[in-house]
């Protein structure tokens, strides 16, 4: 089984893409089928594709305006080139997301569906129930940032990782590595490096607290 098809890895992706749209109270979670989770995930990705393409179209339009004005100002041409490059990059990202939308349902079907559903719902429920404690840990590890100011996808990846470390008995190193993999797929280069740094500070503080408790006892 490829890493992408491992049930828990798929469950993390489902949880990440569903976290902002599914209420985590027990009554609601019990009613969620695997198909419900897949539908929410696909809708989330589709919305992101639409927003990315709209941004790319706006960049191309602005770049075209700068090119038309380039006869009078050389700086306009350079600025237009930058905008077009950004639009190409955004379009490339949207195409990658489209591939994920197409592949994701099949990948889920090829995995252990029961395990995927159970772990995805456990992650969503844990983040929902323990949000205050999780956010406290993350806030203490942020440097020159506020948690609510982070991009939603980065914030959700961080919350899932801390939930797994603190409440689902996932080893710290594994939780960090899995979070980085999620960030590489759904965030950007700056995002996954930022997430890596925050989670390492979280684990350092957790380990220091454990040592302090051991010393006192």
UniProtKB/Swiss-Prot annotation:
Gene Ontology annotations for the cellular component aspect, listed alphabetically: cytosol
Gene Ontology process terms (BP): DNA-templated transcription termination; transcription antitermination
GO molecular function: RNA binding
Annotated InterPro entries: NusB-like_sf, NusB_fam, NusB_RsmB_TIM44
Keywords of this entry: RNA-binding, Transcription, Transcription antitermination, Transcription regulation
Pfam family, any one: NusB
Annotated NCBIfam families: nusB
Protein role: Involved in transcription antitermination. Required for transcription of ribosomal RNA (rRNA) genes. Binds specifically to the boxA antiterminator sequence of the ribosomal RNA (rrn) operons.
Recorded family membership: Belongs to the NusB family.
Protein name: Transcription antitermination protein NusB
Organism: Microcystis aeruginosa (strain NIES-843 / IAM M-2473)
Name of the coding gene: nusB
């Amino acid at each position: 089984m490829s890493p992408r098809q491992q049930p828990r890895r798929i469950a993390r992706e489902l949880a990440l893409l569903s976290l902002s749209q599914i209420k985590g109270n027990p009554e609601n979670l019990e009613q969620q089928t695997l198909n419900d989770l897949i539908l929410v995930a696909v809708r989330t990705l589709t919305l992101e594709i639409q927003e990315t393409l709209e941004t790319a179209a706006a960049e191309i339009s602005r770049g075209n305006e700068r090119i038309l004005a380039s006869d009078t100002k050389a700086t306009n041409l350079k600025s237009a080139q930058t905008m077009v490059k950004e639009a190409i990059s955004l379009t490339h990202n949207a195409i990658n997301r489209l591939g994920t939308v197409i592949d994701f349902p099949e990948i889920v079907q090829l995995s252990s569906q029961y395990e995927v559903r159970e772990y995805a719902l456990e992650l969503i429920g844990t983040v929902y129930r323990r949000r205050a404690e999780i956010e406290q840990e993350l806030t203490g590890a942020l440097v020159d940032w506020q948690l609510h100011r982070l991009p939603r996808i980065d914030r959700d990846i961080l919350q899932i990782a801390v939930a797994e470390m603190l409440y689902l008995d996932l080893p710290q190193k594994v939780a960090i590595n899995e979070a980085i993999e999620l960030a590489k797929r759904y965030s950007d280069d700056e995002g996954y490096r930022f997430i890596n740094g925050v989670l390492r500070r979280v684990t350092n503080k957790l380990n220091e607290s454990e040592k302090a408790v051991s010393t006192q006892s």
